[in-house]
Amino acid sequence: MAQDKFDVGGMTCAACQAHVDRAVSKLDGVQSVAVNLLAGSMMVDYDPAQVSPDDICTAVDRAGYSASPVDAGTGTAGSNGSTQARSGAAHMESPTKKLEAAASAMRTRLIVSIVFLIPLFYIGMGHMLGWPLPGIFTDHTHSMTLALTELVLLIPIVYVNDAYFINGFKSLAHGAPTMDALIAVGATASVARSLYAMFIMADQLATGQVHEAMMTSMDNLYFESAGTILSLVTVGKYLETRSKSKTGGAIEALIDLAPKTATVVAEDGSETTVDVDSILPGQVLRVRPGESIPVDGVVLEGSSAVDESALTGESIPAEKTAGATVNAATVNRTGSFTFRATRVGADTSLAKIIQLVEDANATKAPIARMADKVAGVFVPVVFVISAVTFLVWMALTGSVNEALTSAVAVLVISCPCALGLATPVAIMVGTGKGAEMGILFKSAEALENLRSVGTVVLDKTGTVTRGKPAVTDIVVATRADGSPAMSEKALLKLAAALERSSEHPLAEAIMAECETRGIVARMVEDFAAVPGRGVTAREGQNTIAAGNVRLMNELGAKVPAGLAEQFAAEGKTPLFFAKNGELAGTIAVADEVKETSAEAIAALRSLGVDVRMLTGDNRVTAEAIARRVGLSSEQVIADVLPADKERHVRELQDAGGKVAMVGDGINDSPALARADVGLAIGTGADIAKEGADVVLMRSDLMDVARAIELSRATIRNIKQDLFWALFYNGIGIPLAAGVFFPLTGWQLSPMFGAAAMSLSSVCVVSNALRLRTFKPKVAK
């Protein structure tokens, strides 16, 4: 299977989205289609042996829209994809830029519409509202002048808003009517009725019925109604487009962080400023204080503190010295340094993050399926309701004017856009907010599923703990007379001499502690490993050893009773040291618990989530760790082999409820993939963890709780928008049709209908924008 992303042009509402989806889904070989109305894009999974990108574009064209491939799932990028691969994030065009350009064009249309609408509305409604009008518009002999003036003022409004008519009637011709069709038919009906009235007026004037002609002009001209409908819809579209342009603010901010130029250091030491898109892997670059790092790389010389908050959400700058990795779009705060470029263009962490978020926006949340089904039949149903409304009003009143007023009101008040925007706008804002927090959702489905997770399984190593053993206790042995066997420093020197040649994780922890304290390991002789026990060696005239209780007993070095068990109960592994057959001391090593683990588990509990810890450690050690983070023994799954993690997740799923798995992605990929939602934690710049649905860039367990809160807030926002969109149409359409006329005696004007329709979409987008201010309440 291949996956391609396409730019789709001509979509203006949810009905358009549904028609494109339907047209492509019908093709043989197409497995899934996800159309994003907001971004004007489409993601298609298909079998290249059965269908090609050209076939997909042709299907979209036949549906009345345009499509072009962005980049191919097979790895061969299209034109836009190639540009991104060369230039990376610094030159990526975001949906925000497109929306800002659309808003600018819409503003021009709006200004022209308003300029001509004001005099049109004044002239058309002045006689009804008692406004003063020039005599040429009130004199009965000039009724045709009034009509022609209104028509002339309407023409520029129709001209700048011709897209509604072109797209609307085109969709009708393809048998797939859209919101533009509703507007086009509604406005055309008003204009057609007015032109018909002008013919009647001409006949009346020709036969000397001057007074009747003036009455016809006052009662039967709807030019101002058509102009108002078009102008108000354009007001709504402009506000909607402006609001939508703000939804991608988080990604836009990331793109803006990428510098356009960089300083390349040549072999002779000379420095040259070049465009970022010309940088190649292996080149050496210099970054000065205050500058953004242009590409990913490894520090060669110098040191600095680098602000990585844009990528990871971590507010404290990271210290960078020789050998440390640096990432594009992070900011150098203090010193100057040189680094070698390792990943450039579309391979940088920044470009991958942006692509991941955009791909997530291109997917569809399960909650959107109901809205899509409604949108797919919405417009045809509205046309039927409008036709029925016209016929009923004609039958009841015999008045074409009243029947036309209600029929047009039904057309223009209906709004499938509000339905279509509810999900994608909230998803875009939610995923963008997540990116700001260092939480990357790979799909809209993951964002939705996380909200309903009932159990979170935490892989202990690297998730609850740091994943790297460290020295926790240094205990010097006591002789029979109560004096210490040696000093703490001497014990560490002894340990360093024995462990310098070992590759055991415990040895690495001890050597790291010695290095921190400035202790240099001495050379030893006759070094030997004792399988299952430890190591022995000779240092000068002294025989030294390091190992477990069994080795100490064999050497005659007496270990205090219960000491090993005491450390084990605390989740620590003791390593005993002997010198010339006497116990010299004990160094305990443990995988340290992260500072926020206990707080994070408490936060998850307060969110109503059951927490389990999964580990390969023995139960005694596992329960010791569990106690430190607030978990009971029943919540611990111990003695688990890496290959069995997936089975335990499956068993929890079989017990009922959705399960999320949190791990570092190293040996738990099958478990991450098996879970309803897999979260890879502490990935830093490595965001492409296989099997993970959500990537947590920081090694902070609190981000799991934050991700759940964000998921719940986003889905709650979507439900609010869907409710109000359905409620609006459920009330608005019957009101426009005149269902409540017997009770209220009031008939809705098409102009009010157009205003209400415009505001409904603006309200949906504005509600989604509230997510930009989201702050976790529990996981602060």
Spans of features found by a protein language model:
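ATP-driven catalytic headpiece of P-type ATPases
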Residues: 108, 330, 454-503, 511, ...
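Transmembrane helix-loop-helix hairpins at the membrane interface
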Residues: 103-261, 373, 474, 745
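Flexible metal-binding regulatory segments at protein termini and peripheral loops
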Residues: 1-147, 244, 270-273, 351, ...
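Soluble-to-membrane junctions at the N-terminal ends of transmembrane alpha-helices
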Residues: 92-115, 167-190, 354-386, 403, ...
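Membrane-embedded alpha-helical bundles of multi-pass transporters
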Residues: 129-144, 173, 177, 192, ...
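Juxtamembrane coupling segments of multi-pass membrane pumps/enzymes
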Residues: 201-205, 210-212, 227-289, 320, ...
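Conserved ATP-binding TGD loop and adjacent catalytic N/P-domain core of P-type ATPases
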Residues: 1, 282, 289, 363, ...
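Conserved cytosolic catalytic loops of P-type ATPases
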Residues: 28-46, 50, 54, 221-223, ...
